[in-house]
């Protein structure tokens, strides 16, 4: 593939300043850093996992990083291009709460069917528990399964064992700890 995206075109910058919360200067800075870390202009899943391992040395972030990678890789080609990277970074770092919750919903909805099942929720919660390592937990949240049960008890209003985007959004807003656990912060 060679030096894909080594020079950022002005029309790409214009599109990204419109589509993201970054300025042209910030986009250029991020692009420079992205190319430094990914000289061919592509971030692979293994590279993505390696980055996560730097931030979570006491746990195993591999599973979680792979799940996040899937959401970053919008076109599902097995690599994150700069535009995909900056769009996801814009939402996760500067998006409003609804944007962040929609992004998180996409993370949890592994099969992209518009619902989060208990199994999908367990998959993510288990990955988070593996990533952060042994952390003190309350009795009702000391295993991934207990955490999932608690989340579904709070969010699954129609008791169909799956969460819609609306149930997920409302449930997350009703319990600030869930938003915190998603590392999404506030507005």
Curated annotation (Swiss-Prot):
Residues of the EF-hand domain: 29-54, 60-95, 96-131, 143-178
GO cellular component annotations of the record: cytoplasm; synaptic vesicle
Keywords per UniProt: Calcium, Cytoplasm, Lipoprotein, Metal-binding, Myristate, Repeat
Gene3D superfamilies per UniProt: EF-hand
Residues that, per the record, bind Ca(2+) 3: 156, 158, 160, 162, 167
Gene ablation phenotype (knockout): Increased number of type Is boutons in neuromuscular junctions of abdominal segment 3 muscle fibers and reduced nerve-evoked excitatory junction potential.
Database matches in SUPFAM superfamilies: EF-hand
Lipidation sites (N-myristoyl glycine): 2
List of residues binding Ca(2+) 1: 73, 75, 77, 79, 84
Free-text tissue specificity from the UniProt record: In the embryo, highly expressed in the ventral ganglia.
One MF annotation (Gene Ontology) recorded for this entry: calcium sensitive guanylate cyclase activator activity
Subcellular location: Cytoplasm
Family: Belongs to the recoverin family.
Task of the protein: Plays a role in synaptic transmission and axon terminal morphology. Inhibits ric8a-mediated promotion of synapse number but does not affect ric8a-mediated neurotransmitter release.
Name of protein: Frequenin-2
Organism of derivation: Drosophila melanogaster
